[in-house]
Each structure stands twice: as structure tokens, then as C-alpha cells.
């Protein structure tokens, strides 16, 4: 199981040549379980101006696994954020903490291209896939 960070989805949808796009394509072709949460979908859809584009994304995500939002996930994300702040690490987005918490609770690997996940993985049991 893999949870895919928004930055990877954006590269995938825009046709970027980043290694994560290739990796996501492989996972989709292999029919691996791709997880997402509502925040990831929101971040992707917020940047799409055309209604048809939003409908296309919604349709694509219907074939993926939605992880329902739980209070425990929110509390873990807040703990991650606060603990790393105490250690002097600047996490740029609380959303990354929420994605990491979702991955920890589901046992999924995070496919990303964002340094925040590597900081988190140094202190919490989140598995990341990197180049």
C-alpha cells in the first residue's frame, strides 16, 4: 500500500519527468493499492480551474482507496508537528504531518518528493519511498 503525496500527483498530472511520476505509473499499472485522504484530493482539485478537469480527477480517485479521517490521525499529526518543532525542525506543512500520520496508522509507504517526510521518518515509524 502506498499513500501518494500531493506533489507527486501534481507532477503525474502535469506530465513532469520526475522519478516519482514513473514510480506512480508503475504502481497504478501493477494495481497496487493507492491510498489517499480528503486533504490530498482537496490540494489537487484546488489547483484545477476547469470543471471537466475536476470531474476527471474525481473519477480517477474513485478507483483508489480513501482512508477515512479519524480523530486519532489528527492527534498524531499534531504530535508529530509539535515534537519536530521542539527539536528545531521546521516542517513546512501540517498537511505533511497528516499524510505521515495516515501512513503510520495504515502501514502504508509514502511516495513523495518533499523533505518534510524525511524529517518525520527520522523520528516516527513512517516508511518513505525516495530516489
Placement of each model-derived feature along the sequence:
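Active-site neighborhoods of divalent-metal-dependent phosphate/nucleic-acid chemistry enzymes
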Residues: 65-111
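Conserved glycosyltransferase catalytic-site signature
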Residues: 6, 38, 95-97
Amino acid at each position: 500500500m502506498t499513500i501518494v503525496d500531493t506533489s507527486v500527483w501534481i507532477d503525474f498530472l502535469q506530465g513532469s519527468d520526475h522519478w516519482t511520476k514513473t514510480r506512480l505509473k508503475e504502481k497504478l499499472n501493477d494495481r497496487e493499492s493507492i491510498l489517499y485522504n480528503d486533504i490530498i484530493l482537496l490540494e489537487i482539485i484546488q489547483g484545477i480551474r476547469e470543471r471537466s478537469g475536476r470531474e476527471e480527477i474525481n473519477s480517477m480517485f474513485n478507483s483508489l482507496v480513501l482512508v477515512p479521517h479519524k480523530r486519532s490521525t489528527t492527534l498524531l499529526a499534531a504530535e508529530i508537528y509539535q515534537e519536530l518543532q521542539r527539536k528545531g525542525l521546521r516542517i513546512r506543512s501540517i498537511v505533511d504531518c497528516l499524510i505521515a500520520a495516515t501512513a503510520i496508522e495504515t502501514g502504508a509507504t509514502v511516495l513523495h518528493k518533499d523533505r518534510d517526510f524525511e524529517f518525520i521518518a527520522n523520528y516516527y515509524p513512517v516508511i518513505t519511498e525516495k530516489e
